[in-house]
Amino acid sequence: MRKAAQPVVMLMAALLTACTADSGRDELVVFGAASLTDALIDLESTFEADNPDADVKLNLAGSSSLREQVLGGARVDVVITANLAVMDELVDSGEVRPDQVSIVATNGLAIAVALGNPGNIRGIEDFERSEPFLGVCSPAVPCGSLAYEQFESAGIAASIDTEEPDVRALLTKVIEGELDAGIVYESDIVIADGAVDGILIDAPEVRYPAAPTVRSQNPELAEQFMAFLNSSDAQEILTDVGFRQR
C-alpha cells in the first residue's frame, strides 16, 4: 500500500553532485512535473532494472520551475511537463525539437477533500464560498492555471486562501487538515491512498508531453528512456498510480 504523498522537494542539488565516473554508470537527468512524482520514482526503478548501466537522476518540481531551470542552462536529458504550453516554450527556445515531443500520460482534474469533509464541499461551485479553507496551485503552474480556467468557465468568483507552488504541496495541506479542499489531479487522489476524498471535475483532459533535450549529454540513453516511457510496461505503471489510459 502506498503511503500518503509527501511534499515535493527540489532534488537537483543532492542528486547531481555524484558524477557518472563515481557510479560507473551512464547518468540520465530527467526533469518531471510534480504530479508525476510517484510514477517517475517507479519508472526510474524499472528502467534501471532493465538497463543496469543507467543511473537515472530525477528533478521533480512544478512545470514552470522546470522550464526556468532548462532555460537557465541546467543539465537535463529528458523533460516531462504537465501541459503543452510549457513544452511549446521549450520548443520555441530551441531546447527541444518539436518532432521529438510525445504525449506519455494523461490525467484529469479533481477536488481533494479533507477526510470528514469539514467544509461540506460538494463540487467546484463551493470554491465561491468564503467559510471553507480552500487552495489551488499557483496559476504559474498547470494545475493552477487549469483550476482558474474552470472557475472562469463556470462563472465562479473563487474565494481562495492559498496558492501553492506545485500540486504535491497543495495535496499535503489537504491531507494534513490545513485546507478543507484543493484542486489537484485525479492521480493525486489515488496516490493519497485514502488520506483524502476525491470529487472528479468535468474538465478537458490534461496531457503530459515528454522530450529529450537538444543539449542532452547522453542522447542515446535519452532516446531509450523516451522509448520506455511509451512502452506498455511504463503505461501500466502510470495507470497503477492513477493516470488515465493514454
Located regions from the model:
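A short, gly/pro- and small-residue-rich
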Residues: 93-100
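Exported/periplasmic ABC-transporter solute-binding proteins
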Residues: 19-49, 55, 64, 68-71, ...
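Short, solvent-exposed coil/turn linker segments
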Residues: 3, 15, 97, 120-123
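Sec-dependent bacterial lipoprotein signal peptides
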Residues: 1-17
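Periplasmic-binding protein-like
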Residues: 76-81
